[in-house]
From Swiss-Prot:
A Pfam family per the record: Aldo_ket_red
Lineage: Eukaryota, Metazoa, Chordata, Craniata, Vertebrata
Gene responsible for this protein: Akr1d1
Its job: Catalyzes the stereospecific NADPH-dependent reduction of the C4-C5 double bond of bile acid intermediates and steroid hormones carrying a delta(4)-3-one structure to yield an A/B cis-ring junction. This cis-configuration is crucial for bile acid biosynthesis and plays important roles in steroid metabolism. Capable of reducing a broad range of delta-(4)-3-ketosteroids from C18 (such as, 17beta-hydroxyestr-4-en-3-one) to C27 (such as, 7alpha-hydroxycholest-4-en-3-one).
First-listed, main subcellular location of the protein, grouped into a coarse class: cytoplasm
Organism listed in the record: Mus musculus (Mouse)
Residues reported in the UniProt entry to bind substrate: Y26, Y57, W88, E119, Y131, W229
GO MF annotations, alphabetized: 3-oxo-5-beta-steroid 4-dehydrogenase activity; Delta4-3-oxosteroid 5beta-reductase activity
Protein name: Aldo-keto reductase family 1 member D1
GO biological process: androgen metabolic process; bile acid biosynthetic process; bile acid catabolic process; C21-steroid hormone metabolic process; cholesterol catabolic process; digestion
Catalytic activity: 5beta-cholestan-3-one + NADP(+) = cholest-4-en-3-one + NADPH + H(+); 4,5beta-dihydrocortisone + NADP(+) = cortisone + NADPH + H(+); cortisol + NADPH + H(+) = 5beta-dihydrocortisol + NADP(+); corticosterone + NADPH + H(+) = 5beta-dihydrocorticosterone + NADP(+)
Residues annotated with Phosphoserine modification: S228
Cell compartment(s), UniProt: Cytoplasm
Amino acid sequence: MNLSAAHHQISLSDGNNIPLIGLGTYSDPRPVPGKTYVAVKTAIDEGYRHIDGAYVYHNEHEVGEAIREKIAEGKVKREEIFYCGKLWNTEHVPSMVLPALERTLKALKLDYIDLYIIELPMAFKPGKEIYPRDENGRIIYDKTNLCATWEALEACKDAGLVKSLGVSNFNRRQLELILNKPGLKYKPVTNQVECHPYFTQTKLLKFCQQHDIVIVAHSPLGTCRNPSWVNVSSPPLLNDELLTSLGKKYNKTQAQIVLRFNIQRGIVVIPKSFTPERIKENFQIFDFSLTEEEMKDIDALNKNVRYVELLMWSDHPEYPFHDEY
């Protein structure tokens, strides 16, 4: 794979391309107003052409404003930018899918997006509330029919509102549900999952490669250490001694080593940052490469432990992480 800062796209099975690095725009807690706008502009100036967002991040309007401004400046053309949006759990009902995508397009003020994915395979009670709860504070689940939801996504593609379709946090069984669906029109081209040296996803990666599905790694640098939703029993990834020593060898940060590891495996990375220096640093991964031996050594760091377990929803019938992969 001959990658450079200017050319770092890989092909999707539907004929479209996806840049191997994108800017993640999720923040917990929510970013201060204006912060996402600045981050996206910084990223585009630096050479990023892929922005990963979602309705539930509450900042798609800022992402759109930044993209449109950079297009108006002549820095980029719309077709050079790759935006991924996500369908949230409360909108899996087929009749709600198109309006959900249209709301994203309205927030972005764009005519189409490049990739629309089902954010999680777990449906919640349909409606306006993002986290619908019962009187005991528990999330109200809904019966999931992933195939019906997928058909509604296919209709969005037919309407020209999105170029590619994918999923996120799906296990093998859930991917097979879609892949084996009678009358399947468009295959999922991506599966966005947690993936990094402590959680290498080798089996899921192999399965996805067999079906021409690209893995997009969320939390590619590990995550924040918020114990309310993060498994903090696994040590912070970026403190690892091997990554530190490789960083010294290549004059790179541990984060750059980790990101390089995944892109050399053909995995797309979407590190999130709202700090201009970090946004720039994360992109500087095209001027070195790891040896085969180093790749094996990093791969051997795998602990098979997730940071993002979503245990609060582990009793959902479609909770994806009970299965081995």
